[in-house]
Amino acid sequence: MSELAEKECVPCKGGVPPLKGEELERLARQLPGWEVVDEHHLRRSFRFRNFREALDFVNRVGELAEEQNHHPDICFGWGRAEITVFTHKIDGLTESDFVFAAKVDRL
């Protein structure tokens, strides 16, 4: 499991550049199953046996988001959920996005 999950999400104050290049790739290697899309956001799809399992998972992600004060975009339906993570304030990726994704993997 990634050591990223041991960290905490840090609120972004803005004015920092989004992660790019080697640093982005280094962090992405620690999150198998997550896709880096256009160097802008992280995305992962999850499958479940039914609607209730998907809903329970989404609720746990929501609780994590509130605890970490880092809020993903969530899309879900019968037997599936998709989580998209990026830092809205800078419209790109920060280390906190990778931390959050690693924490989602622990749910």
From Swiss-Prot:
Top-level lineage group: Bacteria
Keyword set includes Transmembrane helix: no
Keyword Lyase: yes
Catalytic class of the enzyme: lyase
Catalytic activity: (4aS,6R)-4a-hydroxy-L-erythro-5,6,7,8-tetrahydrobiopterin = (6R)-L-erythro-6,7-dihydrobiopterin + H2O
EC numbers, comma separated: 4.2.1.96
Keywords assigned by UniProt, alphabetized: Lyase
InterPro entries per UniProt: PCD_sf, Pterin-4-alpha-carb_dehyd, Pterin_deHydtase
Listed Gene3D superfamilies: Transcriptional coactivator/pterin dehydratase
GO molecular function: 4-alpha-hydroxytetrahydrobiopterin dehydratase activity
GO BP, sorted A to Z: tetrahydrobiopterin biosynthetic process
Pfam family, one: Pterin_4a
UniProt xrefs under NCBIfam families: PRK00823.1-2
Family assignment from sequence similarity: Belongs to the pterin-4-alpha-carbinolamine dehydratase family.
Listed name of the protein: Putative pterin-4-alpha-carbinolamine dehydratase
The species this protein was found in: Rubrobacter xylanophilus (strain DSM 9941 / JCM 11954 / NBRC 16129 / PRD-1)
Lineage per the UniProt record: Bacteria, Bacillati, Actinomycetota, Rubrobacteria, Rubrobacterales
